[in-house]
Amino acid sequence: MVSDRSGQRRPGKSRVPGALRSRVYLHIGEPKTGTTFLQQVMWSNHAQLAAQGIVLPGYSHRDHSRASRDLREAPRVAGDPAASWAGEWDVLTGQALRAPWAAVISDEVLAACNPPQADRGIRSLLPAEIHVVLTVRDTASLLRAEWQETVKCRATVPWEEWLAGVMGTASAADRRRRSWFWTVHDTLATLRMWSRHIPPDHVHVITVPRQGPAEALWARFAAVLGIESSRIDVPSARVNCSLGLAEAEFLRRMNEALPDGMPDWFYTRNIKQILAHQVLSTRSAQPRLALPTAQQEWASEQSEILFAGLRDAKYHLVGDLHDLLPPPASGRYVSPASVPTQQLLDAAVHAAAALADHQFRASHPVRAEPQRPRGLRQRASKLEWAVLNGLWTRRLLHNTSHLAPVRRLRVVIWCLLTHPARHRPNPAVAGDLVDGGGENRTPSPGRGRIRART
């Protein structure tokens, strides 16, 4: 059963005839806390969510990821074939504000925003009723998951050395924001930053269940949205699975051998998404990474600090705070550096065979009968994908996506194609678009003016 400290049901449908404000749920992370699983559940059930009053702006999670990069001012790598993400945050928030019901924006790396970026994120969603959602887990399992994620992102730092670096910056506030781990996992600081302009009961902290099926995490997330989790189909496929001890060490050593000239975007698409996620993580019954004995006490202390901080705060807690306390360690610690050579060789052979199969399938694709898109939403998704990825449009998009008229046009197209019956043109919306929208716009009839809390 989901534990809700407020004891209140939070309805999903927020915009009804006569309502003053829309509602937007901003799911900001943290990474490695089941966020990918929750996003997969929502995007594979967007029609069922809409039936319960929850809308996902954009056409896929990629739109949320690109918007997050725009908000965080993430630099583009030279040669990256992906389209520019300049202006994507304004497009996504514009769609969320014009959604017919409550909207959800979800990207785990939003936790990496600095204070000015978080302030901009909140201001851009006014005058909506804004809710910030954060999922959290115990420190010990988080450390294991994050090191593996760094390895899947081309890192070469051994486990014990990486762990020492995280521990060395834990108490230095000026260095904390320079460490990626603490940038996205300094939970109490992240909550303070995002909650400065919204009521504390609009900040929802969800603990990741320590045991049990993945559906339990979805049930907690659905409780925050105010919808019935049982009416949503939860995918059976495992998402973002962890690597075995030998697989993680093999990938780390392979990263050391890769040429410096290989671009990061190529690594992400082929090594991380194919080799790590689809191949190495599927090798079952492999020994798993554990914390060294000397570091287990430190991880427990960090979990207790988080436990006490959330217990004393006024945020809306969903789940059990005891999920944040790691269970006692069991078994003998095995360092990744001491994995037997035969286990590394087995992982390497498995990886080489899978990459060869992937290359063959990529060069000899099976041609299937073209399927006609069904529904306006699917057609819109295919159309925008073609536009964003067409070679002849990339330069044009790079030069114009930041322009306000282009952003507003994309918002209008999304509204008309995804919810045509609820977005018929009217003078209020048309005037809003001409005036440029934003936080200083004149409210439409029936909509109150909302000011940011200072």
What are these regions (language model features)?
Residues 2-454:
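Anion-recognition interface
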